[in-house]
Amino acid sequence: MASSYKMSEQSTTSEHILQKTCDHLILTNRSGLETDSVAEEMKQTVEGQGHTVHWAALLILAVIIPTIGGNILVILAVALEKRLQYATNYFLMSLAIADLLVGLFVMPIALLTIMFEAIWPLPLALCPAWLFLDVLFSTASIMHLCAISLDRYIAIKKPIQANQCNSRATAFIKITVVWLISIGIAIPVPIKGIETDVINPHNVTCELTKDRFGSFMVFGSLAAFFAPLTIMVVTYFLTIHTLQKKAYLVKNKPPQRLTRWTVPTVFLREDSSFSSPEKVAMLDGSHRDKILPNSSDETLMRRMSSVGKRSAQTISNEQRASKALGVVFFLFLLMWCPFFITNLTLALCDSCNQTTLKTLLEIFVWIGYVSSGVNPLIYTLFNKTFREAFGRYITCNYRATKSVKALRKFSSTLCFGNSMVENSKFFTKHGIRNGINPAMYQSPMRLRSSTIQSSSIILLDTLLTENDGDKAEEQVSYI
């Protein structure tokens, strides 16, 4: 009995030990599985954060930095280079300011929302302000392109009337109108504000929702994109047609032999044979022999024979500029069309997949942002003066080149009282030695007075003989 009891006790003890061992093994195995699961989740989280960081770095390097840097170069070039300070380039400067503000205030915050998975990470009051700046600067960039195309077409179609209004003050008025139109399109965003989730105010996505901004999305797409697009396309084809027509007329114009009697207006030198010096004289039958001495006839005719060549060269340069403008329009369509078409579809299509459309908008808006970085490249790399300025600014050289400084010095040295022959001799002796080529030279009369507004008036520069094509190319705007 005692022996049986001892055997039973030993058996119970063995079973208890075995049970505890099994329980320990099960707990250990379960703990190991949970540990592996946690480690796997942590690994996936780290990998997800790594992908987000890589995506952010790619956007910063490929889009934001070039946008900021390129537009700063454009602003510096127009502000510092005297040769670039004319009305058309002030439009470019304003366009560069709009694109620069996109790179400084819009793109970084948009990138921040990507890193936080579309959750607004900043104070809620800043959300409407950021949306307003986004719409404002992007619209201003598009409106500047539209205004440039209109201004260019008018300048080619009616050059005399356009040149009369082509002052700095007029350019600033046009730029102000462009910014006011952009503000008018974007102002409904901060007025209406965004709809806040009362239950969870920290889980807010900063975006224009269909329920609250549906009508604005339709209006904004039409006013900020499709209307300017229509204007740009129409003016572009009208510009091409006008240039082709002018090129045809110049090409098929019968050659004319210029004589001393075919020149309606010339700038005269100060001559001792006259009682009072005349700068500009209208030629009539009673004074022709006095005003144009026979000794200068051949020189005058040689200078006037280049007018036709310069007209053809100018039209050729305008055609090349229009091709560059075509590249700008093509890139504009390529970069902004997907966003605005998707935005319009999201506002009008109730049966469409809203989640898919919102995802597409997040992608397409960055393609539109790229346009702000491309604009300064396309508009300025076709211009030699911009390229030279960019090269100096990149090397932190913000001073004018030696040739430009010398040109300013010679411009102040050459006087109106001297004859054209005397000024030409002075320039030939000193100008080439200091690095000034004939294409860079402008007569004191042109530097002092504005362009005479008449198709029958011809301005005789001091040097217009050998490098006429280069001079015309340098004077024609490539915008």
From Swiss-Prot:
The chain crosses the membrane at residues 56-78, 90-112, 129-150, 171-191, 216-238, 324-344, 360-381. A motif (NPxxY motif) lies at residues 375-379. Disruption phenotype: Partial embryonic and perinatal lethality, due to heart ventricle hypoplasia and impaired proliferative capacity of heart myocytes. Mutant mice that survive into adulthood have a decreased heart weight relative to body weight. They display dilated cardiomyopathy with a loss of ventricular mass, due to a reduction in the number and size of cardiomyocytes. The myocardium from mutant mice displays abnormal organization of the contractile elements, with an irregular array of sarcomeric myofibrils and abnormally wide Z bands. It is a multi-pass membrane protein. Glycans are attached at N29. GO terms for molecular function: G protein-coupled serotonin receptor activity; G-protein alpha-subunit binding; Gq/11-coupled serotonin receptor activity; GTPase activator activity; serotonin binding; serotonin receptor activity. Disulfide bonds join C127-C206, C349-C352. Ubiquitous. Detected in intestine, heart, skeletal muscle, testis, urinary bladder, stomach, liver, lung, brain and kidney. Detected in osteoblasts. Detected in the raphe nucleus in the brain, in dorsal root ganglion neurons, the brain stem, cerebellum and spinal cord. Detected in interstitial cells of Cajal in the small intestine. Its main location: membrane. Keywords: Behavior, Cell membrane, Disulfide bond, G-protein coupled receptor, Glycoprotein, Lipoprotein, Membrane, Palmitate, Receptor, Synapse, Synaptosome, Transducer, Transmembrane, Transmembrane helix. A motif ([DE]RFG motif) lies at residues 211-214. One of its GO terms (cellular component) is plasma membrane. A motif (PDZ-binding) lies at residues 477-479. A motif (DRY motif) lies at residues 151-153. PANTHER family: 5-HYDROXYTRYPTAMINE RECEPTOR, 5-HYDROXYTRYPTAMINE RECEPTOR 2B. Ligands are bound in a hydrophobic pocket formed by the transmembrane helices. Belongs to the G-protein coupled receptor 1 family. This is 5-hydroxytryptamine receptor 2B. It comes from Mus musculus. The gene is Htr2b.
